[in-house]
């Protein structure tokens, strides 16, 4: 489902701007600080209920203003994002308020931006977060198990920090075990499928590249074994104030040509792996759900050589609606994008003297 138009009021540096979009490729270009990224950030918030720039949506409100409003037409639906300084966030679809949970998987997006590069360069927690988000987009069951497990984990950790009675702590063991084991079961299945998508992308690359993601989790993920691990580690957990067993500790390791990318990878290998991850993510969501995710490319072409840029262009050709931000049109053309195609649209932004 493509976004037809958007209006932003006091959102970042957009005081009152509106744009119509093409269902194909939309190139948003202009100098830095002109508000290019803010447009795809707004699309991301409406699709996911979250920003990729900040965890505090109050920061999206224009300086010295009381609220930010984004209105958009997604297919046949009217959507509104309203953020006040209380702080309070509301997202409505056809005047019916929706939670972030309601939005997950409805209008999936694939974001390719500098903020996402930590997927390969960052700690295991970044890759867990990435895969949890991707898997939640294609499986409501996975998402619900993740939410329920996270709630049980948070409550159990609170009791551990407070040095509560063991019987109180054990109250949260049952939901932790139930949802944790269900999470493990589906995580292993989806992880295997995602690796096959990576393998397919690597097979189409003109250089010999072998990339795979290993998942380090217990070999026995049954409920009895999980319960035993919790009992065995309880004394240490009380001392440290946190739960020491469960899916929240799983480790994803990226191997590039049989070596740990995070430890031994070059900058070029990180960039290539990141792009392959994103191409695989797009194909994975499309294959599993039948939906073509909206592609959000933020300031990408200026950082890519021609070969890697062409790999992204191949992704664009297989995508639905695409948004690209760039400082000029020349590099987009160099990577094969026809700016004169009537199915594509260019939007030129000029930096305001107020910014």
Residue ranges and their predicted role:
Residues 1-31, 167-178, 182-294, 303, ...:
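Conserved NTPase motor "head" modules and their coupling/switch loops across ABC/AAA+ ATPases, GTPases
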Residues 36:
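Conserved lysine of the Walker
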Residues 44:
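Helix-to-loop junction immediately C-terminal to a conserved catalytic motif
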Residues 47-126, 132-138, 142, 195, ...:
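Nucleotide-state sensing region of NTPase/ATPase domains
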Residues 72, 321-328:
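Structural recognition of the conserved hydrophobic beta-strand(s) that form the central parallel beta-sheet
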Residues 103-106, 113-178, 352-355:
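A conserved P-loop NTPase coupling/switch region
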Residues 298-300:
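Walker B catalytic acidic pair
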């Amino acid at each position: 489902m493509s976004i037809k138009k958007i209006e932003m009021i006091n959102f970042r540096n957009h005081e009152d701007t509106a744009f119509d979009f093409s269902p194909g490729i939309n190139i948003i270009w202009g100098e830095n600080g002109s508000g290019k990224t803010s447009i795809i950030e707004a699309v991301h918030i409406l699709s996911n209920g979250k920003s990729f720039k900040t965890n505090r949506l109050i920061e999206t409100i224009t300086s010295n203003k009381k609220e930010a409003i984004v209105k958009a037409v997604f297919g046949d639906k009217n959507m509104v994002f309203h953020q006040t300084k209380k702080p309070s966030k509301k997202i409505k679809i056809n005047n019916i308020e929706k939670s972030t949970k309601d939005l997950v998987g409805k209008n999936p997006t694939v974001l390719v931006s500098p903020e996402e590069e930590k997927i390969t360069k960052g700690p295991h927690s970044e890759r867990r977060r990435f895969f949890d988000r991707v898997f939640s987009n294609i499986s409501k069951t996975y998402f619900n198990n993740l939410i329920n497990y996270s709630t049980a984990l948070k409550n159990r950790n609170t009791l551990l920090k407070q040095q509560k009675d063991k019987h109180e702590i054990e109250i949260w063991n049952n939901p932790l075990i139930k949802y944790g084991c269900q999470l493990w079961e589906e995580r292993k299945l989806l992880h295997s499928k995602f690796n096959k998508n990576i393998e397919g992308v690597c097979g189409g690359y003109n250089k010999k590249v072998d990339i795979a993601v290993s998942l380090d989790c217990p070999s026995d993920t049954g409920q009895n074994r999980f319960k035993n691990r919790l009992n065995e580690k309880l004394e240490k957990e009380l001392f440290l104030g946190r739960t020491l067993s469960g899916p929240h500790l799983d480790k994803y390791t990226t191997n590039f040509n049989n070596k740990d990318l995070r430890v031994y990878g070059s900058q070029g290998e990180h960039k290539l792996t990141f792009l392959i991850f994103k191409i695989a993510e797009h194909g994975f969501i499309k294959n599993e759900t039948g939906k073509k995710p909206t592609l959000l490319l933020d300031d990408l072409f200026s950082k890519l050589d021609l070969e890697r840029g062409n790999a992204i262009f191949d992704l664009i050709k297989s995508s639905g609606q695409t948004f690209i931000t760039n400082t000029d049109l020349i590099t987009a053309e160099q990577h094969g994008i026809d700016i004169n195609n009537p199915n594509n649209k260019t939007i030129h932004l000029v930096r305001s003297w107020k910014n």
